[in-house]
């Protein structure tokens, strides 16, 4: 079997295709979560905390060159080391939301699988088998 045909067999298996579809959907879903975090949740948190833009929350770890604007992008371009905790907070919130949603999906899937795997009611024993068991039991019983 040539390498190309082996690869074709591998690529056409259901698991690989399912994985590819999952990765594509996951990437698209990640963008939705990014939007929810950046456009809906972080502005509300920023409003409560008093800062509207978390991405510009940082601490300079060195003095900037004279005339450098005090924005994160300008300081990074000037080579000033900064501790950008605002961006980190946004990413942490993003991760927590994504992890929670995935947990809820897996939980629902597992419950659905458990429901499908519930044992069926035992089948009714056919009459001929019941009769044979009765005959067997009567033959085993002590005679008086």
Swiss-Prot record:
Keyword match Cell inner membrane: yes
GO cellular component: plasma membrane
Classification via Gene3D superfamilies: Large-conductance mechanosensitive channel, MscL, domain 1
Membrane topology: Multi-pass membrane protein
Protein name: Large-conductance mechanosensitive channel
Superkingdom as given in the UniProt entry: Bacteria
Family that this chain belongs to: Belongs to the MscL family.
GO molecular function: mechanosensitive monoatomic ion channel activity
NCBIfam families membership: mscL, PRK00567.1-4, PRK13952.1
């Amino acid at each position: 079997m040539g390498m190309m045909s082996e690869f074709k067999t591998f690529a056409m298996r259901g698991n690989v295709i399912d994985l590819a579809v999952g990765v594509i959907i996951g990437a698209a879903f990640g963008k939705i979560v990014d939007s929810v975090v950046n456009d809906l949740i972080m502005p509300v948190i920023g409003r409560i905390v008093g800062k509207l833009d978390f991405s510009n929350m940082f601490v300079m770890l060195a003095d900037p060159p004279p005339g450098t604007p005090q924005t994160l992008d300008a300081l990074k371009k000037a080579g000033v080391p900064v501790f950008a905790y605002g961006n980190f907070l946004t990413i942490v919130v993003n991760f927590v939301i994504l992890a929670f949603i995935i947990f809820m999906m897996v939980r629902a899937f597992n419950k659905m699988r458990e429901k499908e795997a519930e044992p069926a009611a035992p089948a009714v024993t056919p009459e001929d088998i019941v009769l044979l068991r009765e005959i067997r039991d009567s033959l085993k019983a002590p005679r008086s």
